Amino acid sequence: MSFINYSSREINCKIVYYGPGLCGKTTNLQYIYNKTAAETKGKLISLSTETDRTLFFDFLPLSLGEIRGFKTRFHLYTVPGQVFYDASRKLILKGVDGVVFVADSQIERMEANMESLENLRINLAEQGYDLNKIPYVIQYNKRDLPNAVTVEEMRKALNHRNIPEYQAVAPTGVGVFDTLKAVAKLVLTELKKGG
């Protein structure tokens, strides 16, 4: 969970973007990074493998205020979407404060979405987390594609608990910051509860 840096008076929170391969996790993070003021963000780190990559960076949003005199710094991570990188996904989930599940809206990716969501549940449970109890939002990405299923179908397949959900077209930024703000607010609410 979050850790406190007393010398800089910052609470550090980890948000992980999770989802199947090529659903837009990396595109989300790159868009956020490119639109975040240079003085509020760290370096964008990319760990590449032959077929996938993990991105992460941290930033200090100025608009979210303070909690008990501490600023909140968010560390954003993507997980590799390919199934054979499951050990990496588990490692990246360690210490998570909030999750964005990025779903690919294309009809042919619905099964991959459902498998990835179940994989998220399992990997969180193995580390003592419950997806029902941590800050969590869903992003339905690639809404602009002609083969995108309806939001109702996405909801029926992926959002049984009626958690916050957002439509997105990550390359153009549609829905990207709405999704991030939603999960950040949920994380801050948990922090204020002392959770």
Curated annotation (Swiss-Prot):
Q: Which CDD domains match?
A: Ras_like_GTPase
Q: Which InterPro entries match?
A: Gliding_Motility_GTPase, P-loop_NTPase, Small_GTPase_ARF/SAR
Which ranges form a coiled coil? 99-128
Per its UniProt record, what Gene3D superfamilies does this chain match? P-loop containing nucleotide triphosphate hydrolases
Query: What's an example of a GO molecular-function annotation for this chain?
Result: GTP binding
Q: Where does GTP bind?
A: 19-26, 78-82, 141-144
GO aspect biological process, one term: regulation of protein localization
KW Cytoplasm (keyword) present: yes
Q: Return the SUPFAM superfamilies for the record.
A: P-loop containing nucleoside triphosphate hydrolases
One GO CC term, this protein? cytoplasm
Q: Taxonomically, which superkingdom?
A: Bacteria
Q: Which UniProt keywords apply?
A: Coiled coil, Cytoplasm, GTP-binding, Nucleotide-binding
Record keyword Disulfide bond present: no
Q: What does this protein do?
A: Required for multicellular development and for both mechanisms of gliding: social (S) and adventurous (A) motility. Acts as an intracellular switch to coordinate A and S motilities. Controls the direction of gliding and gliding speed.
Give the record's family classification. Answer: Belongs to the small GTPase superfamily. Arf family. MglA subfamily.
Q: Oligomeric state and partners?
A: Interacts with MasK and AglZ.
Official protein name in the record: Mutual gliding-motility protein MglA
